Structure formats: structure tokens, C-alpha cells
């Protein structure tokens, strides 16, 4: 065809190639729960944080115990008076082993950039070694599960709470989470773990599937993102329809980057580019190099 024609608020553009670097986790998933929109207090998704809300001294409800929740719950426990955590399905969690680099290490990296490159390579290799435990290797999965169980046992002494936080599915079936401080936060006396889904909302009362009722002042939805239906896909029209229509039966591409029927379109962090065992930054860098080589 004649290339790509783009319509923007500042006018129309034409280009021979189009690179979509729109990100993947951009559209929050909001559950369809009776009464949710009528919640009596501040209500927001973790990706649309309302910084005007005062959390100090508040009773905070959090819906979800996935990747978003393990990042925000520890801080909410530090700030709020009480946190009620509604968990539909627990996740396997392994140590993140996060730490700050020392001043000496920073000086060494500054003096020898190759040392930083070697460290990055080592971290990549460590991530790749984790793939077997997520891809059906029974021995690797069993070893990883034992590590996750040991992590849980070391940080959660209460047997009943441990049981509630233990998944009933095989390691690797769902996204494995990394956290050093989520379990300690959940063991706090300022946290109530409700091991059932949110069924409905009545004013400021959260009604769980178990029938339990919890009063909260603020409600945070840590309910994830719509990652399989990208909003930009509805705006991109190729030879035979929109990208959303092309992907209606499932997102497919070559090398996670180029899509049949959409000439000179490149999608960064495209289908199957996101990883559960290593850094997506590495994937995006490889895609960017592929785009540059293709257009050179």
C-alpha cells in the first residue's frame, strides 16, 4: 500500500513504518461485582492510584493477591490502620532477594562497565535457568515448589494461615511471584486474610463468598490487567481489517514483533514477548534491534 497514515490530535501523519511501543499492562481489569460502583468510600485500581486519598489510619480493603497485590500490600500495611485482603486464589511465591548495591559495588561498576555487563549476563542466565520449572519439567518444578514452600514456612509460622496461602495447583501453572515482604505483611496483626473472593459490596461493607462481612474505608482493586486485548489494536487497520479483528482468535505474530497482513508494523512487547521467568526488558531490547535491522 501507501504506507501508514496516522491521525493524531495535532494533525495527520504519514510513515513508511509504524512501531507500536504502547506497553502491555495498561488497561485495568475491573471485576463485575454487585454493588462495587456504589462503594461508600474511595475506590480505585492499583494502576489508577488516587494519590489524594489519605491512607493513614484508614481501614483498607484490597481485592486480589497476585503480582500487583504483593507489591502494594506491604506498604499499605505500614500506612493504614488495618488491611483486609481478599484472596480468591493464592499464588506460589519465591524470594526476590532484593537488596541495594553497596557504594563499593557502584564504584566498581563505574570503573569497569564490563563488570556491569557481566552481572547483567549472570542475572539473565539465572532467569533462564528458572524456565524449566515453569515449562513442565517435573523435577525442576518439584525443586522450585519446595523452595516456595520453604519460603512460606520461614515467613508464616501460623499453620492455618500457611494453609490459606498455599496454592492447590502445580507450581508454574500460573504466574510465579517474587517477594520478600508480602508474607511478613500478611502475618501482621493489622491484616485480615479473607480466603475467598469478593462477592458483593454493600456501602462500606465487603461481602465475601464465604459470607464474611468486612467494613473498610478505602477499597483498592489489585485485579490485574486486560493483557490479551490491547486497546491500540482497535485503532490499527491493516489490509483486511483491524489488528483487534486479526487477533480475535488469539494474538499471533512472528518473533513477537511483526504481524501478517500489517506490512511494516512492528509491535514491541507483542504476543508472547512477556516472560514469567526473566526480564521483559531484555525481550524489548532484542525486538528494538530487530526493528532497526529491518528498517536499515
Regions inferred by a protein language model and the residue ranges of each:
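Short beta-strand to alpha-helix junction loop
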Residues: 1, 63, 135-144, 169-181
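Conserved beta-strand-loop-beta-strand element in the redox core of flavoprotein oxidoreductases
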Residues: 1-13, 41-46, 197-214, 219
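Helical element adjacent to the flavin cofactor pocket in flavoenzyme catalytic cores
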Residues: 7-9, 13, 173-204
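Short hydrophobic core segments
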Residues: 12-26, 60-63, 83, 198, ...
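Rossmann-like dinucleotide-binding core of oxidoreductases
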Residues: 13, 21-157, 191-192, 269-296
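Short, conserved catalytic or adaptor-binding loops enriched in Gly and charged residues
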Residues: 34-39, 183-188, 257-259
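Short, surface-exposed acidic
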Residues: 154-167
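Glycine/threonine-rich phosphate-binding loop and adjacent beta-strand/alpha-helix elements that clamp
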Residues: 218, 222-295
Amino acid at each position: 500500500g501507501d504506507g501508514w497514515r496516522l491521525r493524531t490530535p495535532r494533525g495527520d501523519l504519514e510513515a513508511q513504518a509504524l512501531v507500536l511501543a504502547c506497553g502491555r499492562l495498561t488497561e485495568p481489569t475491573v471485576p463485575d461485582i454487585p454493588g462495587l460502583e456504589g462503594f461508600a468510600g474511595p475506590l480505585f485500581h492499583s494502576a489508577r492510584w488516587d494519590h489524594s486519598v489519605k491512607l493513614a489510619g484508614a481501614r483498607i480493603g484490597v481485592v486480589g493477591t497476585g503480582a500487583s497485590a504483593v507489591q502494594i500490600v506491604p506498604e499499605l500495611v505500614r500506612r493504614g490502620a488495618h488491611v483486609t485482603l481478599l484472596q480468591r486464589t493464592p499464588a506460589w511465591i519465591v524470594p526476590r532477594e532484593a537488596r541495594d548495591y553497596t557504594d563499593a559495588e557502584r564504584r566498581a561498576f563505574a570503573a569497569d562497565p564490563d563488570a556491569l555487563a557481566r552481572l547483567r549476563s549472570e542475572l539473565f542466565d539465572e532467569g533462564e535457568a528458572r524456565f524449566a520449572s515453569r515449562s513442565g519439567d517435573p523435577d525442576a518444578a518439584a525443586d522450585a515448589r519446595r523452595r516456595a514452600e520453604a519460603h512460606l514456612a520461614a515467613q508464616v509460622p501460623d499453620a492455618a494461615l500457611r494453609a490459606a496461602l498455599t496454592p492447590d495447583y502445580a507450581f508454574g501453572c500460573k504466574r510465579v511471584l517474587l517477594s520478600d515482604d508480602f508474607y511478613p505483611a500478611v502475618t501482621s496483626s493489622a491484616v485480615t486474610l479473607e480466603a475467598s473472593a469478593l462477592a458483593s459490596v454493600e456501602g462500606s461493607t465487603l461481602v465475601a463468598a464465604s459470607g464474611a462481612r468486612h467494613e473498610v474505608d478505602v477499597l483498592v482493586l489489585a485485579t490485574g490487567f486486560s493483557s490479551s486485548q490491547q486497546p491500540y489494536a482497535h485503532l490499527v487497520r491493516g489490509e483486511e481489517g483491524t489488528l483487534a479483528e486479526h487477533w480475535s482468535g488469539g494474538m499471533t505474530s512472528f518473533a513477537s514483533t511483526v504481524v501478517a497482513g500489517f506490512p511494516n508494523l512492528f509491535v514491541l512487547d507483542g504476543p508472547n514477548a512477556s516472560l514469567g521467568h526473566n526480564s521483559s526488558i531484555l525481550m524489548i531490547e532484542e525486538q528494538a534491534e530487530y526493528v532497526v535491522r529491518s528498517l536499515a
